[in-house]
From Swiss-Prot:
It comes from the Eukaryota. GO terms for molecular function: heme binding; iron ion binding; monooxygenase activity; oxidoreductase activity, acting on paired donors, with incorporation or reduction of molecular oxygen. Residues 93-119 are annotated as: Disordered. This is Cytochrome P450 71A8. CDD domains: CYP71-like (cd11072). One of its GO terms (cellular component) is membrane. Its cofactor is heme. It comes from Mentha piperita. It is a single-pass membrane protein. Its EC number is 1.14.-.-. Keywords: Heme, Iron, Membrane, Metal-binding, Monooxygenase, Oxidoreductase, Transmembrane, Transmembrane helix. The chain crosses the membrane at residues 16-36. It is found in: Membrane. Belongs to the cytochrome P450 family.
Length: 502
């Protein structure tokens, strides 16, 4: 009797507990759905942080960047999306591989250059690098006094003479020519003559020393300083000699530029041809541009010219010829245009260049396919902003993968093919207004001197196509396209070719 009653009580309790648990589960589910919905509608969470790849302790994603960060960042973006939050030691940059949406009228108030980089000593720009009134005045001087179309045209004789020397060297060669080396020498000579009034070549002790300093300077600009990302590991830069190299090259470059300025000030009548240093010293002495500049500012501007105008120009020529040798049908089409425009004339003029539409398409396609500086100069958010639906808090470093943007399938048809024809009926240009093609950057921080390198690039390539037929060496039927890390991405193996005089 008691056992039956006890069993009935247990069964009733079991039913109550079951109903209670079911009720609790139902309430919990309703609460979970409500909380999730509330969180998704919460203003705080509407704009979340960008997705992040998995990271290591302390180092974060540093090792994942590898020696060619533009490739690895694009691979990560394929998994995590076009905008990512990285963890590079203590630095948390946002990386983007897709062209930005909308206009950038307010970019000045949103972004600035990062401060505190150890390699900043190389650029001698600590006093003038920040965005402010003085920086704007210096940029105005560069645009108006140094890099205007009129000024670029004034250096036409320099381009013509140095290009003629290059054509002679190629013509005098009986076999393979090292185009990589020749393009580097050409651009160094053009930039040196334009910037400081003379060139520094082999056989000149001072010239060889300067070229050595310049090579190491450009190499260090592309190096990664572990102390910039993990401040607690600053001592590694001391042990591996990085800090020592930075200080030595900064000192040697400063001494060289100071010597150039001193010679010009002591003997201004000795200048052989117009150059940037003399123009800047005229402003320095007479305040002729309405702004006061000091010697450090002159050095910083000239150093910027060397950094932006030597390696990058040579790299674009190197990759342009690489692709033309890989695609003989494109080369024949370009040669046909150049020779048809020039006809029987020996010298190519600027008017001729303006008529060479396929030449300009080849240059654009080269800079899309082989963006010379694949990762643009990083910027830092000056305030909280929203980018593509994600929150980017103040102080975040922003990295733009211009190389990946140039190969974005949402912007380009067959982006992995070298096809200059895509630009023949297109208004897309590289001057910073079309965000799917930004080899020189965009907005107020874009490179103001695009006219200067383009004049050299187009003139040189047109002459190479007019005066020679080109083929690969007989022992090299297929080109190795491997890239060498650095600020400007060069070929690992120098480009060799055979040029036959026309």
């Amino acid at each position: 009797m008691y056992s039956i009653a006890f069993m009935l009580v247990l069964r009733k309790m079991d039913e109550i507990i079951s109903h209670t648990l079911a009720f609790q589960a139902l309430v919990s589910l309703i609460l979970l759905i409500s909380i999730t919905k509330w969180l998704s509608n919460s203003p705080k969470n509407k704009n979340s942080s960008p997705p992040s790849p998995r990271k290591l302790p302390i180092l974060g994603n540093l090792l994942q960047l590898g020696s060619l960060p533009h490739h690895n960042l694009r691979s990560m973006a394929r998994k995590h999306g076009p905008i990512m939050l990285l963890h590079l030691g203590s630095v948390r940059p946002v990386s983007s591989r897709r062209r930005p949406r909308g206009n950038h009228e307010n970019s000045r108030s949103r972004l600035r250059r990062p401060r505190g980089s150890r390699s900043a000593a190389l650029q001698l720009q600590g006093r003038v690098g920040g965005y402010g009134e003085y920086w704007r005045q210096l940029k105005t001087i560069c645009v108006v006094q140094l890099l205007s179309n009129k000024r670029v045209q004034s250096f036409r004789s320099v381009r013509e003479e140095e290009t003629e020397l290059l054509m002679k060297k190629i013509g005098d060669s009986s076999g393979n020519v090292n185009l990589s080396h020749m393009f580097t020498q050409l651009t160094n000579d053009v930039v040196c003559r334009s910037a400081i009034g003379r060139k520094y070549g082999a056989g000149d002790e001072n010239g060889e020393k300067f070229l050595e300093i310049l090579r190491e300077f450009l190499e260090l600009l592309g190096a990664i300083s572990i102390g910039d990302f993990v401040p607690s590991l600053w001592w590694i830069n001391r042990i591996n000699g990085f800090d020592r190299r930075v200080d030595r090259i900064a000192k040697e470059m400063d001494e060289f530029l100071e010597k150039v300025i001193h010679e010009r000030l002591e003997n201004p009548a000795a200048k052989a041809e117009e150059n940037f240093v003399d123009i800047l010293l005229e402003i320095y002495r007479n305040n002729s541009a309405g702004v006061s500049i000091d010697r450090d500012s002159i050095k910083a501007i000239i150093l910027d010219v060397f950094a932006a105008g030597t390696d990058t120009t040579a790299v674009v020529l190197e990759w342009a010829m690489t692709e033309l040798l890989r695609h003989p049908e494109i080369m024949k089409k370009l040669q046909s245009e150049v020779r048809q425009v020039v006809k029987d004339k020996h010298n190519i003029t600027d008017d001729d260049i303006e008529k060479m539409h396929y030449l300009k398409a080849v240059m654009k396609e080269t800079m899309r396919f082989h963006t010379p500086i694949p990762l643009l100069v990083p910027r830092v958010a000056r305030n909280d902003v929203e980018v593509m639906g994600y929150d980017v808090p103040v102080g975040t470093m922003v990295m733009i993968n211009a190389w990946a943007i140039g190969r974005d399938p949402t912007s380009w048809d067959e982006p992995e093919k070298f096809r200059p024809e895509r630009f023949l009926n297109s208004s897309v240009d590289f001057k910073g207004l079309d965000f799917e093609l930004i080899p020189f950057g965009a907005g107020r921080r874009g490179c103001p001197g695009t006219t200067f390198p383009m004049a050299t690039l187009e003139f040189t390539l047109a002459n190479l196509m007019q005066k020679f037929d080109w083929e690969l060496p007989h022992e090299c039927r297929e080109l190795d396209m491997s890239e060498r890390p650095g600020v400007a991405i060069r070929r690992v193996i120098p480009l060799l070719a055979i040029g036959t005089k026309m």
